[in-house]
Amino acid sequence: MKIPTRKIASAAAMTTLTSVSLAAAIEYRDALDIAVAPREEALERTDSLVLSAGDRIAYNDNVYLLPGYITDLTTLPGIGPNPSRKDYIDSISGGMDAEWLTGGRQSFDLGLHADYNRYFRNQDLNNVSSNDRVAWNWGLGNALSGQVGVDYQRILGGFSNTLVYSRAIVTRTDYFGSMRYQIGPRWGIFGGVLGTEYNVSAAQGTFNNSKSRGVDLGADFTTDTNRIGFDYRFNDSRAPNSIVLNGIVFEPDYREDRARVLLKYALTEKTLIDASAGYLKRQYPNGTIGNFSGEIWRAALQWQPTPKTQLLLGVWRQLDADLTSQTDYFVDKGVSLTPLWIASEKITFSAVIGRDTNNYVGSNPIGPIPVAPITEARHDTLTSETANMLYTPIRAITITVSAGHSTRNSNVSQFHYNDVQGSLSIVYKFFRYGNTP
């Protein structure tokens, strides 16, 4: 019996987390990680097209992620007129997902998703977000295959690591290309290139703008349920501007080497482990500021005791950074537990309980904004609890209800917060063509 490993991803998709790092049980894979992995061949593939529309109403009782002692929001740097700690957000969305088969092993994928996000009170935060992808999946003979494509993301920058509270739109663009050479049915050699561009619209955040170029090489041995392999990634990141941190000129450019062993192994018919472990070294021009070298690892254990229940346990140690603050990065160690229950063909419940600690690497304990100095690097502890219900009354309609709470404690008082969120969303697939879910 083959374990349905795709359910790990579906459980993650149902979960809304305040902290992205709390989703690390399901390892973050960038566009190139996805492109070089063995591709699961879909059965009965056809040309397909899905058009959808939706609406999401969300409530957030701490939009700016402020500590409790701040009561007068009008004194905060950069904040808009008539600010409110609590707010409702209405997000109207539209999307298109398509696949065109142009040959036996050739296809084009297109995904376009846009949201208009309207804040009821903090109207200066209104924004348009999007998450788009176009990719060409190619194959040559029986042994060569790969992907070429572009991913684009546009979001409102969060307020978890900032002391300026104006609207900042963050965009990330990934350009990627990969190739896999299959040596027989089990062994494979892969490689690829990745270019990434970060841009932050707010003037106070432009020091985080960067362009990076990466190369990935590796090999693996795969079966129907198992995979063992290794990969090496080199990344060269360049930022246009230097910044002054704690009185020292800091160059955000860096070079990074990462080597990992990759493992996916079915322990039993009901238990699967997906893990990686390796070593990462990051070097900055300022030899005494910001350099990091050490082990990184992650393990996710999926247990499916019945066809309708699943438990996912994750632990990790990674080098991470907030999307809006690429120069302010940290060592993230955490654990999460994700139960999932398919109550019926139409209703699924899931939850996430997570805890992680973030130890900021000595580039700066709090970033370039001067506040009360501290004698040690910043250290945060985050906890989060989230519950979700997904209801599909008919195949074309999906309704999701979500509620969550998160807390961050820090040795820098400005970064304490408690946050409660809730949301109700509905998505209607009003047009479907081909073999679509």
Regions found by a protein language model. Name each.
Residues 2-12:
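Bacterial N-terminal signal peptides that target proteins for export
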Residues 4, 20-22:
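Cleavable Sec-type N-terminal signal peptides
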Residues 11-20:
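Bacterial N-terminal signal peptides
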Residues 24-437:
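Gram-negative and organellar
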